[in-house]
């Protein structure tokens, strides 16, 4: 069994193909929690909003648990803890806690700088932080931001060159995807300077509502259908065992059938997980994001 695992781990991603598609805008990067955690100091442990780096899901659940008196058994599930906190402090109290953590300008990492250099017309993230936006601003590149809105079947949009947010029906959203990259914050986001615009998919009820809107065509903007259909997906920082992600991708692939393979960079994956995704034309490569970026940059410098 161990030798089989070593053989699987020795398989390298198709770096030249991935770079070629990234450079030409033929890849949609999907950023999970691990993308933000890749910026943390090694062996760091988050304890409170005073820390200079972002929390993991478990650390955030532990913090909300300590603040709310959640009757935990050390098996902390963020969705359940957030649901309990909502019941104890109200939605406003939960959102205030999240805003205090995710609205800050943390140091973004090499991954975010790398993505801000690319021609990708669309970047999808399920993170609440603003690291990818900060990277675009550092590069001086204009970009659109589209945020799933928890409080209504709408999306919040800030267009390239505009400082104003507007609420739009996702089926009627019009954007020039070729004119400026678009960041789609599929699970909401903190909005620095405008906490009333914050939106977080974080409780059990939030996920039920999100999946309901997915079925009703009010969660994902229709304008993203064409790039979803005609692009490779590159998953960075995800644990692909997450059933919520499986449901979301099943819906995307059902509504916008694709003929393109997808790739995932993940530190560890079990055989069942690997087989499940292989059947959906998604190959998991076991490596760190940092090692993946080193290899891709080597290819970029060579070609």
Task: Locate the predicted segments by residue.
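SIR2/sirtuin NAD+-dependent deacylase catalytic core
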Residues: 1-303
């Amino acid at each position: 069994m161990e030798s089989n695992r070593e053989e699987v781990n020795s398989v390298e991603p198709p770096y030249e193909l991935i770079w070629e598609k990234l450079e030409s805008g033929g890849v949609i990067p999907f950023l999970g929690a691990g993308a933000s955690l890749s910026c943390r100091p090694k062996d760091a442990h988050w304890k409170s909003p005073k820390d200079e780096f972002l929390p993991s899901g478990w650390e955030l659940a532990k913090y909300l648990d300590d603040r709310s008196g959640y009757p935990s058994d050390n098996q902390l599930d963020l969705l359940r803890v957030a649901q309990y906190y909502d019941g104890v402090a109200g939605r406003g109290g939960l959102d205030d806690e999240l805003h205090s953590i995710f609205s800050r300008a943390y140091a973004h990492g090499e991954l975010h700088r790398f993505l801000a250099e690319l021609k990708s017309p669309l970047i999808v993230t399920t993170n609440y932080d603003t690291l990818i936006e900060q990277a675009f601003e550092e590069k001086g590149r204009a970009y659109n931001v589209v945020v799933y809105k928890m409080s209504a079947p709408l999306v919040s949009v800030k267009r390239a060159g505009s400082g104003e947010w507007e609420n739009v029906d996702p089926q009627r959203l019009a954007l020039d995807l070729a004119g400026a990259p678009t960041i789609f914050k599929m699970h909401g986001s903190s909005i620095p300077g405008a906490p009333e615009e914050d939106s977080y998919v974080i409780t059990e009820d939030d996920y039920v509502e999100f999946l309901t809107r997915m079925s009703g065509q009010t969660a994902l903007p229709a304008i993203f259908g064409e790039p979803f259909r005609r692009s490779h997906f590159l998953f960075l920082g995800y644990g692909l065992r997450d059933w919520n992600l499986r449901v979301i991708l099943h819906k995307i692939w059902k509504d916008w059938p694709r003929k393109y393979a997808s790739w995932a960079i993940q530190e560890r994956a079990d055989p069942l997980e690997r087989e499940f995704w292989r059947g959906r034309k998604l190959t998991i490569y076991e490596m760190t994001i940092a090692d993946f970026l080193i290899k891709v940059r080597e290819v970029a410098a060579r070609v």
